[in-house]
Amino acid sequence: MVQITKGKFDGLQRLSNDKGVIAALAIDQRGSLKKMIQQAKGTENKKDVEDFKQLVSEELTPYASAILLDLEYGTPAIKARHEGSGLLTSYEKTGYDATTPGKLPDLIEDLSALRIKENGGDAVKILVYYDPDEPAEINEIKYAFLERIGAECRAVDIPFFLEPITYDAKVTDSGSLEYAKLKPAKVKASIKEFSKPRYGVDVLKLEVPVNFKYVEGFAEGEVAYTQDEAARHFEECSDLSPLPFIYLSAGVTSEMFHKTIQFANQHNVQYSGVLCGRATWADGIEVYGKQGDDALREWLRTQGKENITSLDKLLDEGAVPWWTKYGSFEDVHVVEKQ
């Protein structure tokens, strides 16, 4: 049995579908989305980013249990979301200071967990870049930072979703074969660390532990892992986490993310859903940039809808309810926050 405070429990339920699976859409990208729209449209305008997010939210949240948004460009999209769709809100600043070692995280100055909750957020989401092999003087800053977020979320009784993005300080190309060989150990180390109760994380938003571009049978060139090795990494990560976890799409294509989730399903991985971003809507950026709002709306109602509903089917086949890590639904004991 596990005890969960009422605010956290209610938030998790609002973010989940009727099976307890988090089938969520992510569009909290800020700097990267601004650049993509600018390249497609040839102009830079905050309203373009807001409008794109709003259209995606309006058209696709009927097929998502929740949406992840930011308050910098996402307020119109928050208002436009489907009535039954929960809301995760980003708390961290976009990107990191490249002039300082360690990819250190920072928070949006005029935001707090309380303000996120007051704004209708059902959960706080934090992204942190993490290399378990970096010096302690860098990682201790990140650990203390996340301990503070966990305490803040506990204080206002809102779920804390943590997204650790792994990297290697010495191997700068995260898409390389060299990094692909390091990635499984990095992801496992991040699960071990951030599952510790001291951080107060409720759900881990995880990268898949391998780069599918280098998995035998998926790779077009060099191979970093056999399919059996890839399956073992998935299973070990699943077993390592005492917390519910969901997968992020990490900028891959819709086709590749679908194959990834199929692979997880085939190997009985205990994941509780996805937060899928660019894999669902990225191809709509070119349409929006060149042809405008109406063309994007049409794309979202056809290809965008197909991307998200076909992913929903895969989740129906393989994802487990968020409470599975604690046993059954009856094993979750909801208590009032003291």
From Swiss-Prot:
Top enzyme category: lyase
Keyword hit for S-adenosyl-L-methionine: no
Catalytic reaction equation(s): D-tagatofuranose 1,6-bisphosphate = D-glyceraldehyde 3-phosphate + dihydroxyacetone phosphate
GO biological process terms on file: 6-sulfoquinovose(1-) catabolic process; D-tagatose 6-phosphate catabolic process; lactose catabolic process via tagatose-6-phosphate
Keywords, in A-Z order: Lactose metabolism, Lyase
UniProt keyword annotation of Lyase present: yes
One Pfam family named in its UniProt record: DeoC
Pathway: Carbohydrate metabolism; D-tagatose 6-phosphate degradation; D-glyceraldehyde 3-phosphate and glycerone phosphate from D-tagatose 6-phosphate: step 2/2
A GO term for molecular function: tagatose-bisphosphate aldolase activity
Enzyme Commission designation: 4.1.2.40
PANTHER family recorded: SULFOFRUCTOSEPHOSPHATE ALDOLASE
Protein family according to the UniProt entry: Belongs to the aldolase LacD family.
NCBIfam families registered for this protein in UniProt: PRK12399.1, PRK12858.1
Name assigned to this protein: Tagatose 1,6-diphosphate aldolase
Native organism: Listeria innocua serovar 6a (strain ATCC BAA-680 / CLIP 11262)
Lineage of origin: Bacteria, Bacillati, Bacillota, Bacilli, Bacillales
Gene this protein is translated from: lacD
